[in-house]
Amino acid sequence: MIVVDASAALAALLNDGQARQLIAAERLHVPHLVDSEIASGLRRLAQRDRLGAADGRRALQTWRRLAVTRYPVVGLFERIWEIRANLSAYDASYVALAEALNCALVTADLRLSDTGQAQCPITVVPR
């Protein structure tokens, strides 16, 4: 069981490699906000001509088909607020969920592991 953030999910959806292997091998848990973050990340890549429209659509369809357990963020507010000094509310949502579930957080965002705020293991995968 792992919590996966949008950066790692995007890496898995768009590239072969460590992120895809981890996501294929584990039960995935995410805060609800991940779906919007994934759609936003794909949109940004498409606007920069780094991703075609058909590839973006396929990535969204693949994400939708994955067995992912989603959690409301409202139950994580207290911990999100506690770590607000060094993490955005978005990033803190992933950390708080991983802590609550007592599992690792998988991310492609190196700075997330450098804050010293997380009380859970963090695995950084290549983008």
Curated annotation (Swiss-Prot):
Among SUPFAM superfamilies, the record links this protein to: PIN domain-like
Task: Report if keyword Transcription is assigned.
Answer: no
> Which InterPro entries does UniProt cross-reference here?
PIN-like_dom_sf (IPR029060), PIN_dom (IPR002716), PIN_Pae0151-like (IPR044153), TypeII_TA_RNase_PINc/VapC (IPR051619), VapC_family (IPR022907)
UniProt keywords, alphabetically: Hydrolase, Magnesium, Metal-binding, Nuclease, Toxin-antitoxin system
Report the enzyme's class at the first EC level: hydrolase
One matching Pfam family is PIN
UniProt GO molecular function: magnesium ion binding; RNA nuclease activity
Cofactor(s) named in the record:
Mg(2+)
PINc domain sequence ranges: 2-115
Q: Which amino acid positions bind Mg(2+), per UniProt? A: 5, 91
| UniProt-listed Enzyme Commission number(s) | 3.1.-.-
Q: Which family does it belong to?
A: Belongs to the PINc/VapC protein family.
User: Per its database record, what is this protein's job?
Assistant: Toxic component of a type II toxin-antitoxin (TA) system. An RNase.
**Name recorded for this polypeptide:** VapC ribonuclease Mb0985
Give the species this sequence originates from: Mycobacterium bovis (strain ATCC BAA-935 / AF2122/97)
